[in-house]
């Protein structure tokens, strides 16, 4: 009988191997066998924990999304209650170290592509999109009329995704300082008093 906690340890090991496999071989080159080889275990164990490749990608993305939510929660807790500070915290979480490593960025790209074809992954993407929009909208609504807050949240979410996507596709490390400056300048413009 396995030790208490062995399941969680094994799943984490396999998720790490999946991230590395997607980084090195892309999603098409990532198989249960390639993940098993990277983790030095049998393919049967990978199949036991995740069922198939889609289950493996889903579990890996749930892990990445938990990291994103933890970064968001941590950064919002450290920010002041001012909407500008809390918006900046949400932006910074999306460019957190847990979200911009090559393995994670390539996994995000693979996930987005697969989410157009797999209902379970599509649902995860919708949850993530709604969570981001809700967080942004709640902060903008503290200083802007409701309709304007929704527009601002949609615009900032698109900017975050666009900056992140361009960074992921650049083929070099993401310039988080430049991305944060652009997003924070956009927040400042949206919250500036109108004359």
Swiss-Prot record:
InterPro entries: BetI_C, DNA-bd_HTH_TetR-type_CS, Homeodomain-like_sf, HTH-type_TetR-like_transc_reg, HTH_TetR, Tet_transcr_reg_TetR-rel_C_sf, Tscrpt_rep_BetI. Residues 31-50 bind DNA. Keywords: DNA-binding, Repressor, Transcription, Transcription regulation. Residues 8-68 form the HTH tetR-type domain. Repressor involved in the biosynthesis of the osmoprotectant glycine betaine. It represses transcription of the choline transporter BetT and the genes of BetAB involved in the synthesis of glycine betaine. PANTHER family: HTH-TYPE TRANSCRIPTIONAL REGULATOR BETI (PTHR30055:SF234), HTH-TYPE TRANSCRIPTIONAL REGULATOR RUTR (PTHR30055). Coiled coil: none annotated. This is HTH-type transcriptional regulator BetI. Pathway: Amine and polyamine biosynthesis; betaine biosynthesis via choline pathway [regulation]. It holds the Pfam family TetR_C_6. GO terms for molecular function: DNA-binding transcription factor activity; transcription cis-regulatory region binding. GO terms for biological process: glycine betaine biosynthetic process from choline; negative regulation of DNA-templated transcription. It comes from Burkholderia pseudomallei (strain K96243).
């Amino acid at each position: 009988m396995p030790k208490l906690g062995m399941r969680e340890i094994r799943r984490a090991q396999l998720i790490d191997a999946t991230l590395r496999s997607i980084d090195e071989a892309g999603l098409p080159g990532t198989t249960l066998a390639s993940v098993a080889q990277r983790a030095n275990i049998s393919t049967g164990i990978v199949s036991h924990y995740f069922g198939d490749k889609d289950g493996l990608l889903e579990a890996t993305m749930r892990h990445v999304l938990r990291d994103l939510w933890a970064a968001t929660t941590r950064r919002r807790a450290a920010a002041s209650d001012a909407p500008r500070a809390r918006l900046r915290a949400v932006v910074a979480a999306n460019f957190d170290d847990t979200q911009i490593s090559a393995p994670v960025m390539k996994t995000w790209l693979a996930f987005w592509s697969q989410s157009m074809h797999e209902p379970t992954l599509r649902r995860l993407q919708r949850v993530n999109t709604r969570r981001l929009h809700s967080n942004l909208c709640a902060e903008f609504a503290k200083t802007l009329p409701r309709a304007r807050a929704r527009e601002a949240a949609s615009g900032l979410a698109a900017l975050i995704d666009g900056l992140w996507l361009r960074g992921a596709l650049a083929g070099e490390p993401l310039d988080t300082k430049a991305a944060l400056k652009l997003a924070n300048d956009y927040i400042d413009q949206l919250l500036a008093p109108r004359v």
